[in-house]
């Protein structure tokens, strides 16, 4: 329980940020500017919401917890123009918030239980995003930034790095939250590539190849991609079919996807 009488709800994955030093450091990393079009996902009790409002004067926020949503609207009434959407961020169309000539900046202390599906949801709307700053489970950030050859490199690494430059910023200890989570967190900055690394490759096509490859990561690439590409085709692309999926670079996954698309 806390000062507003709201117990953190496990089903929402709630851990409320309360460490002022962390909040200030996160604010410096985001560096909000007066004309920014910004949305906060999962504002909770408003630890970041209030300083963002002080900097911007206006803010969009998405909060699924109805009680917290009502509390935030009341608490921020005299602090600035907070437009709160009491909806599920996993199904929210962020394009409704973007303006024709202004992209959206997205920030948030994301619940651990939805962080990966939410990232994929946002990647599907990458064209309207300026950048993203998230507090995530440290393990997730490690996977986002992982390079080929390591155990952390996988589908999430390839897909996010296809869309964004990944910049891990700093670790946040569990004691910065109430209640404290069982693991540490990390703040990460995601900046969309402009122009796209491969404008002719769709999300669906790359995801099809990468998902199939990593669904059987212990197998060789030739076995993992059976039905999509043959060993001979891999060799023609200069890729050793005996390699394992976690050793293949993003550039090679793009080459595999281009080849597969041409063969359709």
UniProtKB/Swiss-Prot annotation:
Chain residues that bind S-adenosyl-L-methionine: 15, 17, 42, 63, 88, 109
Spell out the InterPro entries in the cross-references: KsgA/Erm, rRNA_Ade_diMease-like_C, rRNA_Ade_Mease_Trfase_CS, rRNA_Ade_methylase_Trfase_N, rRNA_adenine_dimethylase, SAM-dependent_MTases_sf
Do the record's keywords include Methyltransferase? yes
Which Pfam families does this entry report, sorted A to Z?
Answer: RrnaAD
Q: What is its EC number?
A: 2.1.1.182
Where it sits in the cell: the answer is:
Cytoplasm
A GO cellular component entry from the record? cytosol
What Gene3D superfamilies does the database record attribute to this sequence? Ribosomal RNA adenine dimethylase-like, domain 2, Vaccinia Virus protein VP39
Would you tell me the protein name for this molecule?
A: Ribosomal RNA small subunit methyltransferase A
User: From which organism does this entry originate?
Assistant: Nitrosococcus oceani (strain ATCC 19707 / BCRC 17464 / JCM 30415 / NCIMB 11848 / C-107)
The beginning of the lineage is:
Bacteria, Pseudomonadati, Pseudomonadota, Gammaproteobacteria, Chromatiales
